[in-house]
Amino acid sequence: MIPFKEALPQSFAYKTLLSTLYEKDFPVLYPEEIDDLSSYQVLDTREKEEYQVSHLKDAIWVGYDQFPTFNLDRLDKSKPVLVYCTVGARSQSVGKKLVENGYEVYNLYGGIIHWANEEYPLYKGEKRTDKVHTYTRAWGIWLNKGVKVYE
């Protein structure tokens, strides 16, 4: 069992912020709950320029504004989907659309910021990177590990 302190090292303020963004009935996965990322179809719901800075291993870019044009036939309904964005708000919105279409979906708790802060690997293409596009400078205050990119 992971002690509470180790499982959720993010600041109280960050956890409070996330609690205002997430719907209570939409399932989230904490990074430490993911034994094997390849067990999921990982979808990056950020904008293309954010994805190009860094992403989770083998993540498929679907975008947020662009998501309505994504071909859902590319996904396997028998394999769970993990969606993420910067903090989890955009990904929850995309995730809800996937649920409506019959997919089992989880939102990555805290988004790529929490993932990076927990020191899980990030990639630019196939190579590891420590850069994280934080969407805006305002969201960047929550990134404690890695190199912040805003543009």
Question: Model features per residue range: what roles?
Answer:
Residues 38, 77-78:
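Residue-level preference for short coil/turn positions at secondary-structure junctions
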Residues 38-40, 57:
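Sequence-level motif detector for i,i+2 pairs with an aromatic at +2
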Residues 1-31, 48, 52-77, 92-151:
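Rhodanese-like catalytic fold shared by cysteine-dependent sulfurtransferases
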Residues 42-44:
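Structural scaffold elements adjacent to functional motifs in cytosolic proteins
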